[in-house]
Amino acid sequence: MDVRRILTERWDVPVIFTTQVQFLNTLFAGGNTALRRLHALEDSILIFDEIQTLPVRCTYLFNAAMNFLKDFCRVTIVLCTATQPPLAQLEFPIEMSENADLTSDTTELFEGFQRVQIENICKDGGASVDEIADEIVSSAEVHGNVLCIVNLTKQARELYAAVIEHLCESEQDIHVVHLSTKMCPAHRKEVLKSVRTELAGCGQYPEQRLICISTQLIEAGVDVSFPVVYRALAGFSSIAQAAGRCNRHGEMERGLVRLFSFENEDLSRLEDIWQGKKIALDLLYHAEADTILSPHTMEDYFRRFYRVQTARTLRYPMASQNTIFDLLSSNEAGLQQAHEHGDDPALWFTHAFRDAGSAFEVIDSYTESVLVPYAGGKEMIVEFNDKQFDKKMIGRRMRAAQQYMVSLFSYEVKRLSALGALWQTESGILSLREEYYDEAFGVQVNEQRNTCCMI
């Protein structure tokens, strides 16, 4: 019996550290595993870090769940963030206690913790990748270490390549690293470890320079501190998170955060970021960039952000015209359909729990996990491909293999499969061929030439 697994499934221990995804699945996802945890929430204290990252479509579900836990399960809820979204001011609000703020004067607190200066260098029509690369390299020459955060994986790769090309042409010795979710967790940890080591040694070796180009993943509680941070324009909450990686430990009086915009940026698949960017762009026309982290401006941003969301968007819209929020509340569509078929339900509960649970996903999971040949992942691929492998051990070994897995979208899996880059081990684990995993970028979805010649 795996005691650790049982505790993980049931939450039968005093202190639990989990993710927002796992918590929301416990409340709303179908299946029995999540339900085993629900009873453990009674008489508990729930602390949500970075609550502004709550997916927009889960907003009303989250508010209703928090109100239920507070009123019926005697739960105390603490929402932590530097950018508090106005969840208590929506049509279906979260019910805050009186004097809910744990800090008495947020304006005074903001002024006391103002560690960065924000500059808006966006230009009409946006800048090219080469222009941003030149800007970053020039900044590294003057200020030292530079972090650049972009919205898209493609942008991170292109910008990394442009910076490398610029440095090669100018024969400058600056270390450049890349971070994105196309790298497995073990790979990202190794890169972050080297980044922290270089940042820690900058006092001893001030002539050294580091440029880190990353997607938003570095904003998720990663403890790094750069004197200069460039952020591709997005919502103010994202900008605030980026600013949290600048002068984080107060090494200087004020660090520098510069906002820029790419030309022809396609955010059509990232609705929340696209909406946030539009509102941020509008506000930047009417406010000084250096004031956007103030409580007043942040409140204005969130008010506009939720104003443009439709009521349906906040209720978790489904492929049909229904929403999960409606299925779990009045379920009027279900009742109407029952009436039309002469099947009036005799139950007091008319909620469509099964349909709601089947449809609920915190993050669109149109992805497939692939085991990649990075470090220990190579040995795991060999292990899973061994015909003598004990299939009873697959659950335990797969948990260990998570450090070497990359989630790929369906179109990426299709493209890699067409290139012959993916194959299944004897244990049925989808694996990536070695030439399609790059030490700088991670998974390569374009055709790669094999460096080995078979004669």
Positions of predicted regions on the chain:
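SF2 helicase motor core recognition
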Residues: T26, P206-E207, I211-S225, Q241-H249
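Walker B catalytic acidic pair
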Residues: Q20, D49-I51
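Interdomain hinge/linker at the junction between the two RecA-like core domains of SF2 helicases
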Residues: A82-A140
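Loop/turn-to-beta-strand initiation segments
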Residues: D12-V15, V21, E42-I45, F72-V78, ...
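Inter-Walker segment of RecA-like/P-loop motor cores
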Residues: M1-F28
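Post-DEXD/H (motif II) to motif III coupling segment of the RecA-like Helicase ATP-binding lobe
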Residues: A34-I45, Q52-E108
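C-terminal helicase lobe and adjacent C-terminal extensions/tails of nucleic-acid helicase motors
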Residues: K70, A133-H143, L147-I149, K154-K189, ...
